[in-house]
Amino acid sequence: MVSPDTIRTAIGVVGNGTALVLFLSPVPTFIRIWKKGSVEQYSAVPYVATLLNCMMWVLYGLPAVHPHSMLVITINGTGMAIELTYIALFLAFSLGAVRRRVLLLLAAEVAFVAAVAALVLNLAHTHERRSMIVGILCVLFGTGMYAAPLSVMKMVIQTKSVEYMPLFLSLASLVNGICWTAYALIRFDLYITIPNGLGVMFAVAQLILYAIYYKSTQQIIEARKRKEADHVAMTDVVVDSAKNNPSSGAAAAAANGRY
């Protein structure tokens, strides 16, 4: 008979895989930044915030804080490395005040996590108390991360289009939330259950919106394509007309020259 711990580990491994997919989802954005040599209007805040979330979960998973949480450490340690890579690329292609702001946020995060670690490890003397303090902070940051798609969901409702809410990422978020909620329930862990349970709710809400607005999205895309095709056709007509009647173009140029 398979033990609960074995099932929990298997679910955690799947959860690590889906979480890795989510961590890697911004790669196309950074490929664009690399090619253009500029961060344009992109913000570093999501990556700095995700880094803080990962650092706090690594602290939570330490044997001295919450034993038997190796899978929590591995995926969030990997997430830290990925987010640091994103931030390094952002810094490489940003200038002046933007770069200084990111560096300041980064320094503040490192100082905050270091202070929490020092205080918890020195002033809290049991695993239960350490887990509670760090866990509450993780719930706060984790809930904030999972609530981030609310802005996208608002845009979907306003525009009646799911064009900028990829189905694949919504499905990955759902599977990830389910895996980590199940992982936390097998050996009950309130602090992992809360943010991931909320993550499941937000992912389900995204999928419901996708089902509601899928048809209207296709109509919007088709209307845009027709408009672009009409614009191209009209441009071609104007160009052909100018070629076939060059005197009118010369007359127009002369008229413009008089004014």
UniProtKB/Swiss-Prot annotation:
Gene3D superfamilies, per database record: 1.20.1280.290
Q: Which UniProt keywords apply?
A: Cell membrane, Glycoprotein, Membrane, Repeat, Sugar transport, Transmembrane, Transmembrane helix, Transport
Main location class: membrane
Q: In this protein, which residues make up the domain named MtN3/slv?
A: 10-94, 133-217
Per the UniProt topology annotation, the Cytoplasmic ranges are 32-44, 99-101, 153-165, 213-259
The residue ranges for the Extracellular side of the membrane come to 1-10, 66-77, 123-131, 187-191
- Sites carrying a glycan are N76
Give the InterPro entries listed for this entry: SWEET (IPR047664), SWEET_rpt (IPR004316)
| Localization per record | Cell membrane
What processes does the entry annotate via GO biological process terms?
A: carbohydrate transport
MF terms in GO: sugar transmembrane transporter activity
Q: How does it sit in the membrane?
A: Multi-pass membrane protein
Complex and partners:
Forms homooligomers and/or heterooligomers.
State the name under which the record lists this protein: Bidirectional sugar transporter SWEET4
Task: State the organism of origin.
Answer: Oryza sativa subsp. japonica (Rice)
Organism taxonomic ancestry? Eukaryota, Viridiplantae, Streptophyta, Embryophyta, Tracheophyta
